[in-house]
Amino acid sequence: MKNIKEKATLWLSDTFDSETQNEIQQLITENSDDLTDRFYKDLEFGTGGMRGMMGAGTNRINKYTLGKATQGLCNYLKKTYTDQKLKVAIAYDCRHNSDTFSRLVAEVLSANDIHVVLFEDLRPTPELSFAVNELNCHAGIVLTASHNPPEYNGYKVYWTDGGQIVPPQDKSIIDEVNSLDFSDINFNAKPELITEIGAEVDEAFWKASIKNGTFDIEGREDLKIVFTSLHGTSIKLIPEVLKRAGYSQVHSIKEQEIPNGDFPTVKSPNPEEPEALEMAIALAEKIGADIVLGTDPDSDRIGIAVRDSEGKIKLLNGNQAMVVMTDFLMKQWQQQGKLNGKQFVGSTIVSTSMVNDIAASYGVETKIGLTGFKWIAKMIKDFPELDFIGGGEESFGYMVGDFVRDKDAVTSALLACEIAAAAKSNGSSFYETLLKLYTKHSFYKERLVSFTKKGMDGAAQIKKIMIDLRKNPLTHIDGSKVTFVNDYDASTEKNMITGEEKSIHLPKSNVLIYHTEDGTKVAARPSGTEPKIKFYFSVQSQLDTIENAKAKEQELDKKIDRIITEMAI
């Protein structure tokens, strides 16, 4: 506690403004437990940026932690581009203080003689990624904490290609940030270097989205859509892009249209959770809609709900949406005569392996990266000789084409409607399209189970779980022999039958994946953005007919239940 108080006392110096000093002094006087949480560590500027609770302290998002991160970025940009006029794009979401923080970040950049193009109002994250390329920027920054609780905010950094920072830039920027003291931040803004942007970038984005996300289909005017932005940024782009594409029956949830960092109508603004889409699904059932679209606050993730075999609106998981989208895109490329062996799709190590099966059936390669969309964006940069068709991950993110280099709920919403409209016009449905893929390839069933472990104790518990899984590896999972164990921290793939080890040629990451003889996959991974440890379960079995899909799903669900019980997690 003594070291924490000493650390906190430094925040009473003249480096910090009076508001910050008063906030810290009160915590010291009260000897508050909150003081410990605010100062027991520094909020890490990680490989994609920062995310944390707002407030004064080294373990919080505030003027000084954001200022230090930005100053480090400025220093790195100047060392990298010694003879260029630097330009950085900035966007922000609907969260509390996001607009203020974006202005602050712009001021630090301008103080360092860097030209800033700042969105005049909140905008989706994919539009920021697009703007970096469109406006020839050297970097981009978005102020967002995705779907975290209201007390959180965050800071993500993008590089010249519009993708989030990856090696070697990420470590070099982190080193620059860590070398600084708070007193090194230059807050002396140069307003003449800050330019506001908005409508002109929206227009360019809409055109690019329609170019990449629409195809030669029929039935757009007959598709009935319910859309919710969950109080976030997608309200700025999705209704308009659907209208321009020819979708006239779009019903928006009025109560959730207004951007609001408190997210007052939902427990969590996360479209991965069915509860977040309750209002939208209720309206869809009432009006007989075909599809429901819901996005998270910064509009990179999308939840898609469609009518199942019994006519009920059902939220698809990210893997299900991804396989249908991937198959549809490749079918379109095939019909246009564009598949020639020089294309690829992208996915991640914890996402469904069904994507690999589908791509292979079209003669298309699947490239697999670590968890996080930045690795899919990096593939585009690393393989310029190949055309990128699309890519996704299990956490409700998808990207269509390479005009954006991050998951893009806007164009994904458009693509989902194209799939649904085309299916409906042919007497089928989005859901039936999925079931047909299951009969063709195999019924893959996935489930994500997360455990929240907050604070210092929680971090220690998560560490212990991963150590135990490595020291005492599973030999069987639900009676099926473990054949391979992939340890991405050790960069090894071990054959559990022969004992042979191979190298994994991906950056190190604290992920462990078990593979069994019957095609089961179990992955364990601590979250990089939340105090959670995540377990990903994937099981599969052949499906003979669509009519047996419900029974097959129940069978596979029971298998996952058995595995969870067996692992005692």
What are these model-predicted stretches?
Residues 8-105, 195-222, 233:
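An N-terminal, well-structured beta->alpha segment
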Residues 11, 15, 34-39, 43, ...:
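Gly/Ser/Thr-enriched, mixed-charge loops and adjacent short helices
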Residues 39-59, 145-146, 229-241, 297, ...:
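Conserved phosphate/anionic-ligand binding catalytic regions in large, soluble enzymes, centered on
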Residues 89-152, 248-303:
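N-terminal small/polar loop signature for handling phosphorylated ligands or for N-terminal nucleophile
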Residues 101-109, 152-159, 300-319, 355:
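Short Gly/Thr/Asp-enriched flexible loops that form oxyanion-binding sites at enzyme active sites
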Residues 158-186, 319-342, 347-357:
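Glycine-rich phosphate-binding loop plus the immediately following alpha-helix
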Residues 285, 289-291, 312-314, 332-525, ...:
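Phosphate-binding and adjacent anionic-ligand microenvironments
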